[in-house]
């Protein structure tokens, strides 16, 4: 369910934007059950928040499971810095509702398609031709999501029982092309999935290798607990040569990453990592791997072992990731990859006042703090 609302965006200089809120709705799966709730917000007109590009639809992330409140923003910004397509921009905000302070949140571009949306080169109607018939080929946005639920999500079950939610075009039963779109997405994802399971396959026939390599490296660096399980997005569209392929992006949902997933400690010890907060050791390559056959149905695991991806990843890591990480760590004085990627000290300064108020003014702490 959703509600309309009046709202005010107040910048750091006290300037007020009173653009009305068309819809505000609870979001998230497990996160909705937490004390600090996340939301999706749709404004009646385009707004800019903290210098972000103007848009109508935003996700208000609670980051309740992350005591630092910053893992999502750091990895989103890193993804943007290394050239991952459709990296979501975001800002730290203080959220009030009905006069009550709810905490420090991360206001981020919502994963949507459309001319003014995050995925701005496809839209919900691209699957239909001029006569209203389903095209032979068409772009779509999908998410690998093990938590997809019948009756709530528009999804298909693919090889190995993998659930793939169709985010765009997002259709309801009875809509034109409802079943045709499901069959098309299943066919294309299965072909990609089967190719990814073979380390020596020509994955470039099915996917954009560079974006898949970056998606893997973001998850690998972050030791993302949900890697390949949920919130794994792919955009299926034409490349520069006109061939339809899967692009690994947008990146999403990293509050249980960078040493924050208590549940990963046992797994990491099996991989030779004694302390799950360490950055050393492989993660994605072992995630969901079957002990007897060493095979995996986890898409990020399979991508990480593909020969083409590994070859591309070497250059991407040293030419794009390493300069960004060195700048973040304060090892280099400047960085040309992005104007919105910062040093660890700068990230702290961006968040410190809002973060301090989050914990000083509220009675709840995160699950991680409770444990």
Description of each model-found segment:
Residues 40-42, 59-62, 94, 103-107, ...:
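Structural recognition of the beta-strand scaffold that forms the well-ordered cores
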Residues 47-48, 62, 83-88, 100-217, ...:
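Internal "kinase-insert"/substrate-recognition segments embedded within catalytic cores
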Residues 34, 166-229, 237-238, 243-251, ...:
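Middle-to-C-terminal accessory/interaction subdomains
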Residues 5-11, 16-62:
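Conserved oxyanion/phosphate-binding beta-strand-loop segments in alpha/beta enzyme cores
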Residues 65-84:
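A conserved alpha-helical element in kinase catalytic cores
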Residues 88-94, 228-235:
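A short glycine-rich, hydrophobically flanked beta-strand micro-motif that places a catalytic Asp/Glu
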Residues 367-371:
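A short, hydrophobic C-terminal helix/tail in secreted or cell-surface proteins
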Residues 1-15, 357-366:
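Regulatory N- and C-terminal appendages and interdomain linkers associated
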């Amino acid at each position: 369910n959703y509600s309309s609302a009046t709202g005010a965006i107040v910048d750091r200089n006290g300037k007020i934007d009173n653009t009305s809120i068309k819809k505000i709705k609870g979001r998230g799966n497990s996160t909705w059950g937490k004390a600090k709730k996340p939301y999706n917000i749709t404004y009646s007109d385009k707004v800019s928040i903290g210098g972000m590009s103007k848009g109508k639809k935003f996700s208000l992330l609670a980051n309740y499971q992350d005591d630092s409140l910053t893992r999502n923003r750091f990895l989103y910004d890193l993804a943007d810095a290394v050239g991952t397509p459709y990296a979501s921009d975001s800002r730290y905000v203080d959220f009030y509702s009905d006069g009550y302070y709810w905490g420090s949140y991360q206001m981020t571009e919502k994963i949507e398609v459309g001319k003014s949306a995050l995925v701005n080169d496809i839209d919900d109607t691209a699957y239909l031709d001029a006569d209203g018939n389903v095209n032979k080929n068409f772009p779509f946005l999908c998410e690998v999501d093990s938590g997809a639920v019948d009756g709530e999500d528009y999804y298909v079950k693919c090889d190995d029982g993998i659930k793939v939610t169709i985010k765009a075009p997002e259709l309801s039963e009875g809509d034109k092309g409802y079943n045709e779109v499901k069959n098309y997405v299943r066919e294309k994802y299965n072909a990609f999935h089967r190719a990814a399971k073979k380390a020596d396959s020509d994955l470039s026939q099915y996917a954009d290798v560079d974006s898949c390599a970056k998606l893997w490296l973001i998850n690998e660096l972050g030791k993302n607990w949900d890697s390949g399980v949920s919130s794994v997005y792919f955009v299926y569209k034409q490349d520069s040569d006109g061939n339809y392929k899967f692009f690994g992006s947008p990146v999403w949902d990293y509050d249980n990453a960078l040493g924050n997933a208590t549940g990963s400690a046992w797994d990491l010890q099996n991989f030779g990592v004694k302390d799950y907060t360490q950055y050393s050791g492989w993660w994605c390559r072992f995630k969901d791997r079957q002990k007897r056959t060493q095979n995996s149905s986890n898409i990020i695991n399979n991508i990480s072992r593909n020969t083409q991806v590994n070859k591309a990843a070497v250059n991407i890591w040293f030419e794009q990731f390493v300069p960004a990480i060195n700048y973040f760590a304060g090892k280099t004085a400047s960085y040309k990859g992005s104007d919105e990627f910062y040093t660890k000290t700068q990230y702290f300064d961006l968040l410190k006042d809002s973060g301090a108020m989050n914990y000083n003014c509220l009675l709840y702490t995160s699950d991680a703090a409770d444990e």
